[in-house]
From Swiss-Prot:
GO MF annotations in UniProt: ADP binding; ATP binding; phosphoglycerate kinase activity
UniProt: ATP binding residues: K215, G303, E334, G363, G364, D365, S366
PANTHER family tied to this protein: PHOSPHOGLYCERATE KINASE, PHOSPHOGLYCERATE KINASE 1, CHLOROPLASTIC-RELATED
Enzyme Commission numbers on file: 2.7.2.3
Summary of subunit composition and partner proteins: Monomer.
Official protein name in the record: Phosphoglycerate kinase
InterPro entries from the UniProt entry: Phosphoglycerate_kinase, Phosphoglycerate_kinase_CS, Phosphoglycerate_kinase_N, Phosphoglycerate_kinase_sf
Family according to the record: Belongs to the phosphoglycerate kinase family.
Nucleotide-binding listed as a keyword: yes
Cellular component, GO annotation: cytosol
Record-listed substrate binding positions: D27, L28, N29, R43, H66, L67, G68, R69, R125, R165
This protein's encoding gene: pgk
Cell compartment(s), UniProt: Cytoplasm
Length: 407
């Protein structure tokens, strides 16, 4: 990645960073419970090094980020208020929260910043221009963001989870200000470059999640490159159904059955499916679990996890791997009775890593599972903060938020 980094900005001999406005696009899109409490602060923690370095250097730091998918306007449910409190705690310094995105409160607070201050703008997606398909509308929002940091300001892209989006605070802003990759984005891209260019073999890929359609492009791409591709999670049932197996009430995408059959016909020696399944009569944390063979799922039950024999087989595949990429849980890990498959496969990846494998957890639910199941995060070589961005990179797609940094 031929881009300028945070180090270049901090060590620019021509322009002192102290006193300058710096807009940082962070990824602070953390999960909240029904009471609005943060359940996994991983992305907030990952954003700290860049913000800390800038504040320590005396920059006037303005952070922009989103939370959830508000529908085109302010919604208290998606306010960054709990994020600002958590960020203050993790950063060890007060983080102001603006009452709007680029309105009068944001402007007044930006003008009042002193060296080393940190201001978090309210949810950028409260402004519909952020996600507009209209280039002109997005540019107008980007221009309003420039006004907050000033003409001598800079932009630091540090939200890896959004670099696959062509949005005002990710893409358009970088066309208007001197731009740099933050610590997190630079590290993420370096890892993915390593994963795509110099892969040590055997190369094992573990894919989970609920829908085949969400992962189709990455399955097609990685099946050509990997030595083994393990499929679990809800999407394994569409693959099983494509082989004429009855999967009961399990999640199936009927429109993807032919595609799954073709994938198995083409890459049958690479793709590995579960051989046993943990089923239950309903999707519930206290549903009674039962382990059955993958081709013996009762009509009145649904699969909610892979079984112990599948974990054993997948562990054997992973034990000799030199490179591992994992994206997506093996089952409904949020329910303790259906978490063993995800935990078992994760432990197998940790075991391979301990023997020298290079392992990458591709963000999203997999990263949440690692933390929720109490697994050692340092047991993996890298845990990404961006699920969708990681997948699109591995598919070979151009990521707009990275592409623009290279210009």
């Amino acid at each position: 990645m031929a881009v300028k980094t945070l180090e270049d900005l901090l060590n620019d001999g021509d322009r002192e960073i102290a006193g300058r406005g710096v807009l940082v696009r962070s990824d602070l899109n953390v999960p909240l419970d029904d009471n609005g409490a943060i359940t996994d602060p991983g992305r907030i923690i990952a954003s700290v090094p860049t913000l800390e370095a800038l504040a320590e250097a005396g920059a006037k730091v303005i952070v922009t980020a989103h939370l959830g998918r508000p529908k085109g306007g302010p919604d208290p449910k998606y306010s960054l208020k709990p994020v600002a409190a958590a960020l203050s705690e993790k950063l060890g310094r007060h983080v102001q929260l603006a009452g709007d995105v680029v309105g009068t409160d944001a402007l007044a607070r930006a003008e009042g910043l002193t060296d080393g201050d940190v201001l978090l703008l309210e949810n950028i997606r409260f402004d519909p221009r952020e996600t507009s398909k209209d280039d002109g509308e997005r540019r107008k929002l980007a221009e309003a963001l420039v006004e907050l940091v000033g003409d001598d300001g800079a932009f630091v892209s540090d939200g890896f989870g959004v670099v696959h989006r062509k949005q005002a605070s990710v893409y358009d802003i970088a066309t208007l200000l001197p731009h740099y990759a933050g610590t997190l984005v630079a590290a993420e891209v370096k890892v993915l470059e390593q994963l795509t260019s110099s892969t040590d073999r055997p190369y094992a890929v573990v894919l989970g999640g609920s829908k085949v359609s969400d992962k189709l492009a990455v399955i097609e791409s990685l099946a050509k490159k990997a030595d083994s591709l393990v499929i679990g999670g809800g999407m394994c049932f569409t693959f099983l159904a494509s082989q004429g197996v009855s999967v009961g009430k399990s999640l199936v995408q009927p429109e993807m059955i032919d595609t799954c059959r073709e994938l198995l016909d083409t890459y049958g020696d690479v793709i590995h499916l579960p051989v046993d399944i943990v089923v239950a009569p309903e999707f519930s944390a206290d549903a009674e679990p039962e382990t059955v063979a993958a081709d013996r799922i009762p009509e009145d039950k649904m699969g909610l996890d892979i079984g112990p024999e599948s974990v054993k087989r997948f562990t054997n595949l992973l034990s000799n791997a030199r490179t591992v990429f994992w994206n997506g849980p093996m089952g409904v890990f949020e329910f303790p009775a259906f978490a063993a498959g995800t935990k078992g496969v994760a432990e197998a990846i940790i075991g391979a890593t301990a023997k020298g494998a290079f392992s990458v957890v591709g963000g999203g639910d997999s990263a949440a599972a690692v933390r929720q199941l109490g697994l050692a995060e340092d047991g993996f070589s890298h845990i990404s903060t961006g699920g969708g961005a990681s997948l699109e990179y591995l598919e070979g797609k151009e990521l707009p938020g990275i592409q623009v940094l290279e210009s």
